[in-house]
C-alpha cells in the first residue's frame, strides 16, 4: 500500500478517509507541448512527489529504467505514464494517458497528450474534457511550432487557464535571463489568442523535481509559486452547472407499457421535477414528471449527472433530440460556421458528404466553403480550397436536416461535433460551432455511380470491413 494513504487511513479511519476525498473539488488538466519537452516526466514527478506511487510501481520503474530509460542512473519517471511498448521503445507518447492523484486540497485527473504533429488529434481529444492546460517548453529550444499549435487548440476548445512550465531549467543552469526570454516570447504569441486567458509562467525541472511540488533554492530568483501550488489553488468556474439546461437524449427507455423515459446525461444547467420543458426540433412542450436514477428518484439533476426523465405528456422524442427548458433561447438550423481540426491524411474537401455526430444526434453534412486556414505561428489566416492533415480552419457547413445547436463557447456538448468518413466510419475531424447561419435548402449525401459501384464491390469481397451500404444511406 502507498505509505501516504496508509498514514491517512490510520489517522482518519476508512469512513473519514472516504468522506474527506469525496468532498474535494476536482481539476482536470492536460500536459501538452512539443516532442521531448518532458510532459510524461513532469506527470511522473507530480505522482512521485505527492506520494501517489505504490512501492511495487516504483520498483518496476527502477527496473524498466535500466532497460528502456532515458535518464541515465536516475529512475525514468516518464515510464509511469508511457505504458505502450512502442512508447517505451521510442521514448515518446503516442496515446492519451490518463492518471489520477490527489492532495489535501484537491483531486486531479491528468491527460498526458502526445507532442508529435501526427498525433495532434489525440491531443485535441485530451483537451476537450479539461479545465486547464499545462504547456511545457524546453528551456533550451524555446517556443516551437507544436507549442503554438497546442496553445491554439487549447484556446479553441475553450480552456481559459494556461500554466506555461519552462522545463529542463537544469540544462540551462537555472538561468533567469533564459526564462525571461522564453516568457516574453510566449506572451507575445499569446496576445493573439481569443477571449480572456489566465496565463501563469513558471520555471521547473521535472527530472530534478525543481519547483514542481515545492519551491527550490536553485530558483531563488523566482518569486512565484510552485506548479503544484498553482494547480491546487487555481479557480475554475463551474460554467457547465451555471449554463442553460441542455439534455441530449441518448436512449428512449421503454422496458414495459407503463414506463417511457428519456435517458441521457445533463450537458449543462439544472432541471427539477415540475419544470416546463420543450423537445427540439419538434418544439412540443410538457412537464418533468420524474427524474429517475438507479439509486432512486431525484428532485433535481445538474450538469454531469446521468438520469432518465419522464414527462407528464406523451410527446414524440427520439434519440438525438434535445430537451431544454420551455423558455430557452436556442435556435435550430441546418447551416453553421465552425472551426475544424482535421485529423486524417485525406484533406477536407468542400462538397463531400460526411456523417456528423452532435451529442446524441447523427446526421449528414458537407462543407460549402473553407473560409480560411489558421497559421499557428502568428495566428493569421490565409485562403485555402482544402484543409490538410492537422490543419485548423473556419468552414461553412450545411446539414441535411435542421438541428438544435449552441455555440461551442456556450456549451461544448451541444456546440461541438465530430466528422466521420461515411465509407470507413473513421473519425476524421472535430468541429466547434462558432455561429449559427440562416438555414439553406441543400441536398447532401449524393454519391457518384463510381462510388456506389466501388462500395458494392468492397462490401461483397471484404465483408469484414463492415463498410456501410451507400445505397441505403441515400434513402435515409
Swiss-Prot record:
Region (G1): 33-40
Record region (G3): 112-115
Pathway noted in the entry: Sulfur metabolism; hydrogen sulfide biosynthesis; sulfite from sulfate: step 1/3
Example GO molecular function: GTPase activity
Keyword Nucleotidyltransferase in record: yes
PROSITE patterns reported in the protein's UniProt record: G_TR_1, G_TR_2
Region of interest (G2), residue spans: 91-95
Catalysed reaction equations from the record: sulfate + ATP + H(+) = adenosine 5'-phosphosulfate + diphosphate
Top-rank lineage group of the source organism: Bacteria
Signal sequence, start to end: none
Chain spans, region G5: 205-207
Domain tr-type G: 24-239
Subunit and interaction comment: Heterodimer composed of CysD, the smaller subunit, and CysN.
Function: With CysD forms the ATP sulfurylase (ATPS) that catalyzes the adenylation of sulfate producing adenosine 5'-phosphosulfate (APS) and diphosphate, the first enzymatic step in sulfur assimilation pathway. APS synthesis involves the formation of a high-energy phosphoric-sulfuric acid anhydride bond driven by GTP hydrolysis by CysN coupled to ATP hydrolysis by CysD.
Protein family membership: Belongs to the TRAFAC class translation factor GTPase superfamily. Classic translation factor GTPase family. CysN/NodQ subfamily.
Name used for this protein in its record: Sulfate adenylyltransferase subunit 1
Amino acid at each position: 500500500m502507498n505509505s501516504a494513504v496508509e498514514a491517512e487511513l490510520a489517522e482518519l479511519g476508512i469512513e473519514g478517509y472516504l468522506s474527506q476525498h469525496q468532498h474535494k473539488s476536482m481539476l482536470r488538466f492536460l500536459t501538452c507541448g512539443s516532442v521531448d519537452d518532458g510532459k510524461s516526466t513532469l506527470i511522473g514527478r507530480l505522482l512521485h512527489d505527492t506520494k501517489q506511487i505504490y512501492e511495487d510501481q516504483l520498483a518496476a520503474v527502477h527496473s524498466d529504467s535500466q532497460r528502456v530509460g532515458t535518464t541515465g542512473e536516475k529512475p525514468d519517471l516518464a515510464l509511469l505514464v508511457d505504458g505502450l511498448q512502442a512508447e517505451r521503445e521510442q521514448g515518446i507518447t503516442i496515446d492519451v494517458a490518463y492518471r489520477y492523484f490527489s492532495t489535501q486540497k484537491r483531486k486531479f485527473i491528468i491527460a498526458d497528450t502526445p507532442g508529435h504533429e501526427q498525433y495532434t488529434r489525440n491531443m485535441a481529444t485530451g483537451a476537450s474534457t479539461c479545465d486547464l492546460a499545462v504547456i511545457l517548453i524546453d528551456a533550451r529550444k524555446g517556443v516551437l511550432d507544436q507549442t503554438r499549435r497546442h496553445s491554439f487548440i487549447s484556446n479553441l476548445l475553450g480552456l481559459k487557464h494556461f500554466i506555461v512550465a519552462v522545463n529542463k531549467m537544469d540544462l540551462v543552469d537555472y538561468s533567469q535571463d533564459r526564462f525571461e526570454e522564453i516568457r516574453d516570447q510566449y506572451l507575445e504569441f499569446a496576445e493573439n489568442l481569443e477571449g480572456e486567458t489566465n496565463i501563469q509562467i513558471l520555471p521547473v525541472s521535472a527530472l530534478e523535481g525543481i519547483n514542481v511540488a515545492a519551491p527550490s533554492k536553485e530558483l531563488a530568483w523566482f518569486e512565484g509559486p510552485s506548479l503544484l501550488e498553482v494547480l491546487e489553488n487555481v479557480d475554475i468556474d463551474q460554467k457547465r452547472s451555471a449554463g442553460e439546461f441542455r439534455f441530449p437524449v441518448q436512449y428512449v427507455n421503454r422496458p414495459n407499457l407503463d414506463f417511457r423515459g428519456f435517458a441521457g446525461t445533463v450537458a449543462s444547467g439544472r432541471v427539477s421535477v415540475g419544470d416546463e420543458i420543450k423537445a427540439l426540433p419538434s418544439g412540443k412542450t410538457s412537464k418533468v414528471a420524474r427524474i429517475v436514477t438507479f439509486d432512486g428518484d431525484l428532485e433535481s439533476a445538474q450538469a454531469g449527472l446521468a438520469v432518465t426523465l419522464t414527462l407528464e405528456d406523451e410527446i414524440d422524442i427520439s434519440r438525438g433530440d434535445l430537451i431544454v427548458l420551455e423558455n430557452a433561447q436556442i435556435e435550430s438550423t441546418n447551416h453553421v460556421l465552425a472551426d475544424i481540426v482535421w485529423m486524417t491524411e485525406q484533406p477536407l474537401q468542400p462538397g463531400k458528404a460526411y456523417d456528423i455526430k452532435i451529442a446524441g444526434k447523427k446526421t449528414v453534412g458537407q462543407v460549402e466553403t473553407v473560409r480560411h486556414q489558421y497559421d499557428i505561428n502568428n495566428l493569421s489566416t490565409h485562403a485555402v480550397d482544402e484543409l490538410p492533415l492537422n490543419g485548423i480552419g473556419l468552414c461553412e457547413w450545411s446539414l441535411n436536416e435542421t438541428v438544435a445547436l449552441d455555440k461551442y463557447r456556450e456549451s461544448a456538448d451541444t456546440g461541438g461535433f465530430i466528422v466521420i468518413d461515411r465509407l470507413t466510419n473513421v473519425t476524421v475531424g472535430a468541429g466547434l460551432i462558432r455561429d449559427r447561419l440562416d438555414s439553406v435548402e441543400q441536398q447532401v449525401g449524393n454519391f457518384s455511380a463510381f462510388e456506389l459501384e466501388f462500395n458494392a464491390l468492397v462490401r461483397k469481397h471484404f465483408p469484414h470491413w463492415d463498410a456501410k451500404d451507400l445505397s441505403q444511406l441515400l434513402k435515409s
